[in-house]
A protein has these predicted regions:
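Conserved short alpha-helical segments that host acidic/polar catalytic motifs at enzyme active sites
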Residues: 1-278
């Protein structure tokens, strides 16, 4: 995020990031035209080189910015943001039906590139050192959750409405957390092909839905023990927060690194710090 280079002049326009077949691009163009989106800028990655060992051959790594539909003029910022999420989810579900597209993000000033394989070999294969591809805030993780089949939707980092995170750790409370988030009646709380995705969605729920700060995110996912809360100056408030949002407590050692819409970058860990950040 906070893009530079060739994409910097288009910060105010939503950027679609994903992997598409030629048929997927055809479907995308038809879909976006029906909604009134006009292509503003294309920065797609095509490579004629043989992919590295373990990396599937793809048609197009698509990065495309759009002008908003005229019909969206006058909409509130919240409504625009919710519509962007709805469009991304609809495109993702279209692609899941026939494998023609994988959509990772649709948001202003953000691109997401995901692939399977050796990180350095993939970076060289995709030419990620090209001059036009620059950003001031970059989250990169060379792993995905090992408890699930290899799928790009399960690869870190995860992103939702301007908040992003990547995780190293365990989350044995994945089931209850997923059920809680899925019941919040928000389109973006979906997918969950990795238990680490809930870290991003809890961050979104904390900051966007509850209007709380980053410090409260830490108290929600890894709250203090009851005896520690007794000594805290905000004891009553934090006890209420802990008990009312008990369903969002992460059970297991973890380290989370993420970014907020204002480009704040953070790291949060459980109390035992068994997953080092550095």
């Amino acid at each position: 995020t906070d893009l530079a280079g060739e994409l910097e002049p288009f910060k105010g326009y939503p950027i679609l990031s994903g992997i598409f077949t030629q048929e997927g691009i055809r479907k995308l163009d038809q879909f976006m035209m029906e909604f009134g989106f006009l292509t503003k800028h294309k920065f797609s990655i095509r490579t004629a080189k043989k992919p590295p060992r373990g990396t599937p051959a793809r048609d197009v790594y698509l990065i495309r910015s759009y002008e908003y539909p005229y019909e969206w003029d006058g909409l509130s910022e919240e409504e625009v943001q919710n519509r962007l999420v709805d469009i991304r989810v609809r495109l993702r579900r279209m692609g899941e039906q026939d494998g023609s597209m994988m959509v990772f993000s649709f948001w202003p000033d953000v691109i997401m590139i995901k692939e399977v394989g050796d990180p350095m070999e993939v970076a060289d294969y995709l030419g990620l050192d090209r001059m036009g591809l620059k950003a001031r805030v970059i989250l990169a993780q060379g792993r995905q959750h090992t408890n699930y089949a290899i799928t790009l939707y399960a690869c870190h980092p995860f992103f939702l409405q301007g908040v992003s995170s990547m995780t190293n750790g365990e989350n044995t409370a994945f089931g209850p957390i997923r059920e809680f988030l899925s019941s919040r009646a928000f389109t973006g709380y979906m997918g969950y092909q990795s238990d680490s995705e809930v870290f991003t969605h809890i961050l979104h729920y904390t900051t966007k839905r509850l209007g709380l700060g980053l410090d409260m995110y830490k108290h929600i996912i890894t709250p203090l023990k009851d005896e520690e809360l007794l000594r805290h100056p905000d004891s009553a408030y934090l006890r209420t927060l802990k008990h009312s949002l008990r369903s969002l407590i992460i059970d297991g050692p973890n380290c989370v690194i993420g970014a907020l819409p204002d480009n704040t970058v953070f790291m949060a860990q459980d109390s035992k710090k068994l997953r080092p950040g550095v």
